[in-house]
Amino acid sequence: MAFSSAKWLEERGDDSDVMRLRAAYAECVKKLEAPAENVQIPLETFPNGQVKSRVTARRAHVFQDTGFVWGEKVRVEQFKEDGSLFASLDAESCVVDRKTKSGWVEGAAQMVYGDSSVKGRGIYFSLEREFIKIFSQSEIRTGHTG
């Protein structure tokens, strides 16, 4: 899917989901008890059962009551239907909402999408909307040459 600057400009001003997830991150940290280690959680599958997106983390806790996954040393991956990697996000610490497939990164992260990458600190992302918003220390690299 090609980048749409009009779509990005339309969505960039609405921070309601950002605020919701930042609050969820803080609440998850307060409730955290004995996180599991080396966790892998599918977020979504294709109709054929193959994983479309997943979260892996060195340490994680799944909050069954809210659907949130809190993790440290997190990798969120999105795949194409043929199983190849479509996009990935590596983060120090984040919370992911399994229902909306969106998340908030507390600390540093890098997202790779094709031959482009973005990194920074304090990052909101939405897999469904293919949207990312970086709140500080942003850096964008693209392989686009034309």
Where are these regions (language model features)?
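Mature-chain termini and adjacent capping regions
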Residues: 1-146
